[in-house]
């Protein structure tokens, strides 16, 4: 079959089973867009900004496990997408991003809408390609999907000069069924000797803790993780990115850990003698002061990426491999042992954890007339019966959502963890809703974050996406204000958002339903009404207490055991 370069791109997407492409056209990709116009198998979603395309593809990938696909033009189209690409890279999200490029003969001449996309994106992609021949295009696309979805996932970018997709240049189409790359061979299983060594240490542990991250979600390893945790009766804590891999309602779950994790999770981490890290990378928001991190623990680290092991924290038993397979192998080894874990020690350990739990570290003051953001998230959980896909932006509202919306399933909590990208929530929700048209999708955001990509409300109308936007409006860049209160003697430099639009009218101007709530007693009814409109996007502006802070909080430079638990508390 003879195809042009533009037709090859579309045919490759069909052969990869891609159903949705999120993009924005421009001169360098018009040949590809013309090929898209002539077919119906791959649906194109027209966003209103290229950053939105990348975030939507990201949300699609996080909620499905399939690679998200974005298509943007050269120059500013590509640079606008960089924030979304970097967001995906930091959280190891599989994406393939197609960027247009100026024609090959004028590359390097500062041609119109030329940018060094390969150079610009090299630090924030798993790999990138500049296509130099139309004959190489199909194989390059196959490599991109393979690299993006295997090993530690991540975004892969393909930069395509306009002449490569010229409809007058047709070549024989041959899409490879398999790809072999000598320089890229991700491991398929963990070392059995290391697994047995780890189990030997775990069965002797007196104060063990599972510390699990986004890698468990990415590898669809929730079931073997849950099976292993319950077989051993060990406590488990999860990172912001790992929530839902083990059920939030599960009896072994001791809460999220880290800067805004629970008291019991952080104290258990500090006191543990055996730490089993699974698909987590020991980032600074988890460890606190590295020299004080898990001071008495032997550390077992399971990760698909060997470069993550002992990168931030030195580990005792490294296991390189896909976490799903490693966890299955660990459970098999556990079941083969004649002697199980130390039950007497575990009983004492759980008693200590229960004492920490009794601190009730997530309690908040319910007095006063203003709506508390924590309460708003609790109402959201109640109204959606805990069964929504929840996207968020970045800031206090993100932490409140993580703390108070109990996630019992993986891939339901969609947020930017590593890069912390404001503006992520709404376009990510678009990707989620396109992937799950019949599901309930809620975007928890703030008056600061939502305005970063608010133009995507038009995309929602164009494709009839019934997303529910829950805006926790406190009139501030909340997390910035909180840090200024704690560490800058309440000098709120440029963190106030005193001038914002009327979000109800703004939503209505985009063709959606807008609502505003200021009283606690009216919140549940308003939220019930909003979620009752199954076929409409509803923008719910919830005015919340501007003085509310996120607790617990580990202060910068402190250890995990040094937390503020309330406005009145000192470090504990």
What function would you assign to each model-found segment?
Residues 1-341, 379, 383-386, 466-471, ...:
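N-terminal alpha/beta PP-like core and its mobile active-site loop of ThDP/TPP-dependent enzymes
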Residues 9-10, 14, 18-19, 32-36, ...:
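Active-site diphosphate/adenylate-binding microenvironment
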Residues 135, 195, 205, 296-394, ...:
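Phosphate/pyrophosphate-binding active-site segments
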Residues 157, 301, 391, 444-445:
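Generic enzyme active-site microenvironment
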Residues 159-164, 395-397, 543:
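A glycine-rich phosphate-binding loop feature that marks nucleotide/adenosyl-phosphate handling sites
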Residues 213-217, 366, 446-448:
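Conserved short loop/turn motifs at secondary-structure junctions
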